[in-house]
Amino acid sequence: MSDIEARVKKIIAEQLGVEESQVTNEKAFVADLGADSLDTVELVMALEDEFGIEIPDEDAEKITTVQNAIDYANTHQKA
């Protein structure tokens, strides 16, 4: 597991109040991990803070799974 993947999963577990072991790449925030719309907004904000990036609304709407979040962080993180 990459450092980015581990950091993303830790943030998701903390934000959604689930065990880190439940946060697997294929899980969807709403359907599988019980997130609501406010949770997803807070999750995006936490990812922005952690990786020093800004996630536009149109991109945030597409981040619906753990893997989406990992891929986005990998692609957009600041060096």
From Swiss-Prot:
The keyword Cytoplasm applies. One of its GO terms (molecular function) is phosphopantetheine binding. Its main location: cytoplasm. It is found in: Cytoplasm. Signal peptide: none annotated. Keywords: Cytoplasm, Fatty acid biosynthesis, Fatty acid metabolism, Lipid biosynthesis, Lipid metabolism, Phosphopantetheine, Phosphoprotein. It comes from the Bacteria. InterPro entries: ACP (IPR003231), ACP-like_sf (IPR036736), PKS_PP-bd (IPR020806), PP-bd_ACP (IPR009081), Ppantetheine_attach_site (IPR006162). Pathway: Lipid metabolism; fatty acid biosynthesis. Residues 2-77 form the Carrier domain. GO terms for cellular component: cytosol; membrane. Belongs to the acyl carrier protein (ACP) family. Carrier of the growing fatty acid chain in fatty acid biosynthesis. This is Acyl carrier protein. The gene is acpP.
